[in-house]
Amino acid sequence: SYFFFIVVPSLLRPEALFKLFFSLVKYFFMISALSKQILFIVLLTLFKSTSAYLWSCIRNSPWLSKKVSISTCKSALRGLFCKSSWRCAKMNGDLVTIVVALVLGDLVTKVVVVVLAEDIVE
């Protein structure tokens, strides 16, 4: 279990983690209660990994220390994740996108918790 929950997420690129997380969320509502419990643990692990990437991007963003920045980073999801260090400056809009993604990810996790709790109560 250590290999799956620690090593595998760290080997995946950030945008791959993001896609995998939301793909699993999509299928979460179509499976049985037992499978939901297993998938729920996987989703929380992936969310923890992806949100760690996002928060590190925000903390290291030159946008926080510079009034004007130029977006030079390229990523599969238009700046949601940084592939390299944040020496590459991000535009203000990208920072907003990152924050929105974090909030949405948190909401998705809460919805999953509620659905799982309802299944357990039933």
Swiss-Prot record:
Its annotated compartments are: Mitochondrion
Q: Which GO terms describe its cellular component?
A: mitochondrion
Q: What is its main location?
A: mitochondrion
Key words of the record: Mitochondrion, Plasmid
Name listed for the protein in its UniProt record: Uncharacterized 13.8 kDa protein
Which species does the entry assign this protein to?
Claviceps purpurea
